């Protein structure tokens, strides 16, 4: 059986990792913080690799998740906002030099407004774009942010141009990232900057873990490497000029819940640790060099 790459050239692709279950068994949870005690096999779709452009993508790439995002209510994320704020402040420090009081900024996938709330005081105009009605409402009411609920494709055709467009942990979810990159380029001012973050599938950790890599889940459709992302950015006149690693501050409670999913045989130990209240206030700094921030 042959597979076509979803890139514009539709090159022939081959199976990189074969799923060990039927496609109808896959359970897709599009919440940012999705985790549960489901069998981990449900989190591992078949991965394919283009023979020409080397793009790695999921067998679920043709499934439209947009309607699911609209109805997302992510209570786990809300409970983790104090920790998410610490992480996104680290991100802000790394992108700060590209923002100023005259900047008009668009954040694609603004979710519950944590990054927008950090950015807003430092720029002229901040606009968030979000599919989740619940997340957008929360952002508006809690942080008084300008957040629009609209499809990305439709919004980027309005002709407005920005100094900076930010897209953190979003590109891997998009139905058609190639068309979106094309529209983003047209939505940037002449000296505008696109800042996006995603995981680098060619980095050491995913190479070692292979199909057990923790970010290999159904809600992620595309798995870019530094080289494939650079290739597609260049294709749409978005020239990559800088890459920084992305450090995360994660609560121990959230991390233990993740471990329960990925190592169910040790769930008893992780659940025991969760019984201690002090665990809820602890954080750990994580940088395994597989998450990057790209500037173009």
Q: Which residues are covered by each model-predicted region?
A:
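S-adenosyl-L-methionine-dependent methyltransferase catalytic module, highlighting the catalytic core
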Residues: 41, 167, 175-183, 193-296
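Surface-exposed loop/turn positions
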Residues: 103, 191-193
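Conserved N-terminal segment of class I S-adenosyl-L-methionine
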Residues: 1-168, 178-181, 245-246, 278-295
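Basic phosphate/pyrophosphate-binding loop/patch that engages nucleotide-derived ligands
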Residues: 186
């Amino acid at each position: 059986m042959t597979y076509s790459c979803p890139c514009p050239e539709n090159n022939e692709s081959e199976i990189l990792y074969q799923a060990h279950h039927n496609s109808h068994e896959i359970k897709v949870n599009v919440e940012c913080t999705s985790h549960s005690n489901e069998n981990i096999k449900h989190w591992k779709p078949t991965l394919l690799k283009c023979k020409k452009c080397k793009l790695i993508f999921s067998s679920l790439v043709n499934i439209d998740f947009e309607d699911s995002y609209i109805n997302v209510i992510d209570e786990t994320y809300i409970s983790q906002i104090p920790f998410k704020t610490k992480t996104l402040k680290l991100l802000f420090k790394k992108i700060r030099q590209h923002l100023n009081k005259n900047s008009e900024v668009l954040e694609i996938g603004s979710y519950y407004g944590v990054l927008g709330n950090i950015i807003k005081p430092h720029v002229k105009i901040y606009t968030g774009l979000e599919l989740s009605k619940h997340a957008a409402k929360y952002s508006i009411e809690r942080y008084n942010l300008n957040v629009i609920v609209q499809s990305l494709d439709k919004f980027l055709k309005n002709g407005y141009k920005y100094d900076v467009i930010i897209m953190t942990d979003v590109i891997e979810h998009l139905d058609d990232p190639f068309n979106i990159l094309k529209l983003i380029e047209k939505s940037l001012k002449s000296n505008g900057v696109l800042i996006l973050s995603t995981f680098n599938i060619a980095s050491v950790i995913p190479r070692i873990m292979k199909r057990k890599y923790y970010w290999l889940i159904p809600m992620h459709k595309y798995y870019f490497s530094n080289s494939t992302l650079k290739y597609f950015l260049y294709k749409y006149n978005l020239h990559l000029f800088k890459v920084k690693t992305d450090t995360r501050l994660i609560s121990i409670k959230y991390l233990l819940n993740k471990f329960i999913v990925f190592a169910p045989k040790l769930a008893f130990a992780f659940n025991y640790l969760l019984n201690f209240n002090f665990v809820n206030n602890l954080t750990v700094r994580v940088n395994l060099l597989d998450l990057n921030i790209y500037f173009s």
